[in-house]
Structures are given as structure tokens and as C-alpha cells.
Amino acid sequence: MLSSEALAKAVNTARQAIALAVNLDALALIKAEHLGDRSPLALARQALASLPKIDRAAVGKQVNTARSEVQRDYDERLATLQAERDAAVLVTERIDVTLPSTRQPTGARHPITILAEHIADTFIAMGWELVDGPEVETEQFNFDALNFPADHPARSEQDTFYIAPDGSRQLLRTHTSPVQVRTLLERELPVYVISIGRAFRTDEVDATHTPVFHQVEGLAVDRGLSMAHLRGTLDIFARAEFGPSTRTRIRPHFFPFTEPSAEVDVWFASKKDGADWVEWGGCGMVHPNVLRATGIDPDIYSGFAFGMGLERTLQFRNSIPNMRDMVEGDVRFSLPFGVGA
């Protein structure tokens, strides 16, 4: 047990050390030495149990008083050092609120979004309507009503994402053409609509393919429509996207849902390959079976339809060598197209 003189010496030593602490780290070490579990004051408190009961209260009071003095000095020094630290931080990390702020870099709208909106504006200006449909479709709308035969290869799991459970006849639409059927079932004739949305096929991602892509689909059904109306519409569309001098041509092709069917090309001058005919999309007159499937008499009404891939359009229009750039989400790809977020 410490004597009164030793106890006073321990207190003085601790108070002097606390007063000389220059920073919070030094003060923490001093606290451990003079107020910690192995400090002289802590050992003196532990020794109280060995004293006679008659002396324990008086000596215990002395020890508690001594510890309180040291603790008080410690608390005061701690507050002082914390205030000094905070003042130093305010000086070194001061922000001048009168200075202009640092401009934060902004993102950019994806060029596919920009292209889709431009296409929509083009057709809305012509009096067409913008329509939409579900991405999870049934075989009825995606294939059957569009005159796809039961053994058509597009129905296989090698080409189409089917939705579990097996036999549900639900799938991720492989094109935006199901919107045609839904529109004809839901609207009064005549119909002039476009649909812009995502489609899904089991393609590997490479320079010219991606399993999730965007299509624009146009449909017109009215009395007396012909291939001439289709050609005129395609010419207006092409000039809106590629410039006023753009030329188009159509080549015979086959699609289950149009007859006659054609592929449409545009005469386009790229920076890399020069001017040439470039395949753009598919088109044709709506097949009579598609009209019948929606309750329309093909002897009274006729229609035309066309469809283009937005990624394909953007790729050759802007000379983008790799379609992967469109799906990787790197804002540096979108910025050159010039429209901020």
C-alpha cells in the first residue's frame, strides 16, 4: 500500500505529465500509464482490500481524492488538445465559399435513346401514333398471328428465349412485330403507328450482334395502300436519319408476315468504305393471313409494315466498328454524340 507521501508523489508525477502532453496521442499514453489498470493509483485501490477495516475508509478516501485530481487534470487537458486539433483542422481544411465551385462531370444520354426519340418525332410529325407492347409475349402474338408456320426455325430454343415453366408458351419477344397484332385488335381502322422497343434473341455478343437490341416497327392499314405508299414512307424516314440526299432501294425477300416482302437498302457514304448500298431493314405489304387473324377483311383493307434495328442503324450511320460499345455502359461512348444528361 502506498504511503501518503508516495500517493502525493504519484499524483504530482501524473499531473505534471498530463500538463506536458503536446497532442492527443501523447495524452492517451499518459492516461494508460497514470490512470490505467497497472498505474500506481489503480494498484493502491486494489490494495485497499488488504487493510484493516478501521483504516480502509480513510485510506480509500485519500486514494479516490488523488485519482479524482488526476482525472480532472486529464479531462481538462483532453478538452484543450481537442479544441487545438479542431482549430487546426479548420485552418488547414478551410473552404472558401466565395470561390466558384468545381464543375462535376455529367453523364450523357445514350445514342440509342437519342435515335429512338428522333425517329418518334419524325413519324409523329407525319401524323402517326407511337404505341407499345409487352416484352414478355405469347407464341400466339409473337409467331402464330404473324403467319409463322409451326416448324419455322425462329420458334426453336436456339433462337428464342422461352419463359419457364416449359409449355407456358411465354417468351421474350424476338421482334416488335407483336405490337402490330395487338394494335389491329385494339384500334379502329385506319391505323398508322410505330413502335420502338427492345427485342431478344439468343445471339452471342460480337461486333454486329447483341442478344438484347432495339427495333422500330411501322404499320399502316387503310383502304388502298400499296407498295408505292411504303416506298414513299421509307424515303421520308431515310432522309430524316441519313440526310436529304439519301436514296433507297428495295430487294425481294421473304418474311412470313408480309407479302410481297422486301429488304430495304440505303445508299450511304461511310468514312471508311465510301459510298455503297447498305442493308437497313425489312418491309412489305401486310400478309392477308395477318389481317384475317385480327378480324380485318384483306379484300377491303391493305397495309404495309417495316422494321429496322436501332443498333444496326446507329452502327453504320456513325461508323461504329463494334456493337459491344453500345451495351457496355461506358459514358465515354455516349459523350461524343453531344447531348448531356
Curated annotation (Swiss-Prot):
Q: Which GO terms describe its cellular component?
A: cytoplasm
InterPro entries per record: aa-tRNA-synth_II, aa-tRNA-synth_II/BPL/LPL, Phe-tRNA-synth_IIc_asu, Phe-tRNA_ligase_II_N, Phe_tRNA_ligase_alpha1_bac, Phenylalanyl-tRNA_Synthase, tRNA-bd_arm
Keyword Transferase set for record: no
Q: Which UniProt keywords apply?
A: Aminoacyl-tRNA synthetase, ATP-binding, Cytoplasm, Ligase, Magnesium, Metal-binding, Nucleotide-binding, Protein biosynthesis
Q: Which residues form a coiled coil?
A: none
Subunit: Tetramer of two alpha and two beta subunits.
Family of this protein: Belongs to the class-II aminoacyl-tRNA synthetase family. Phe-tRNA synthetase alpha subunit type 1 subfamily.
Q: What protein name is recorded for this chain?
A: Phenylalanine--tRNA ligase alpha subunit
- Natural source organism: Mycobacterium leprae (strain TN)
Q: Which gene encodes it?
A: pheS
